[in-house]
Structures are given as C-alpha cells and as structure tokens.
Amino acid sequence: MQTLNVGAGRTDEEYKEAEDQRRADLLANSRSDANYFFVAAGLAALGTGLLPVRLNILVSIGVLDLLGLYGRSLNPVYPLAMYGAAAAWVIMLLALGFAGRNGHRWAFLAGMLLYGADMIALIAMFSLWVFGVHAFFVFKWFQGQKALKDLQDPGASTF
C-alpha cells in the first residue's frame, strides 16, 4: 500500500476519489450560485415594469432609477428608452447566468462588477433595502467565482 504525504495516510486511490468528489462539489456549488443570475433577472423584470405587476419597493435597478429621475426631460422616447434599458439589463443577466452555468468564471466577475456599480447608484437614490438585495447577489456570485477558481487550481485546499 502506497501512501501520499498530503493525504494523512490515504492511498493514491482514496486521494483521487476525494479529489474527484471535491471537484464535483465545487462544480455543483458554482452552478448553484450561477442560478442566482436567473433569480436576479426575474426580480429585475418584476421591479422595472417588464411584467404586468411592478414591485419596485423590494427590488429595483439603481441605474434605471437614475435614468427615470434625470431622464424625464427627454422627448416621447422616454418610456421606450426605459423599457429598452430594463430589457437589456434582464437579457444581460440571463446571458451571464448561462455563461456561469457553463463554468465561465468571467460571468461571475462581470455580474459582480455590474451589480457593484449599480450599488453605487442605489446609494445615491437612498435605496438601502435594494442595496442589501444587491449585496446578497454579489456575495453569491463571489462564492461562485471562487468555486470555479478553486476548481481550476488543482492544489487548492477546501479548508
């Protein structure tokens, strides 16, 4: 029986099985965290008026709030611009969700950057509850990108 120094008495076979299990767990965790892109897209559609019911007290997009506040002096194109920007936001979140589920770490980083920038706009609009919802998504996407980073690093420890 051959043992490895890193496995605390485990054989090569046991070590490989444990490593395969760790990799499977990390992949499952990253896919689970990528599903939050779809939740965010649904909440964004709910908060921006793309759905028949609008609930912008609990969920909102800071950039669209600023556009609504300062963009009212536009011409009759204003409602179309608001719906177009909201639809682009939702489509972007859906695309990031599919990319994240396929194991692309950049999707998580882009989502964190997108929502981090939007959190600045939310602070300007004094939407603290929505800021907390955004922070939750940023945290979940950070966990997803970290799982993919650990998955790509063969010597990473799970401790």
What are these regions (language model features)?
Residues 2-159:
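Topology signature of small-to-medium multi-pass alpha-helical membrane proteins
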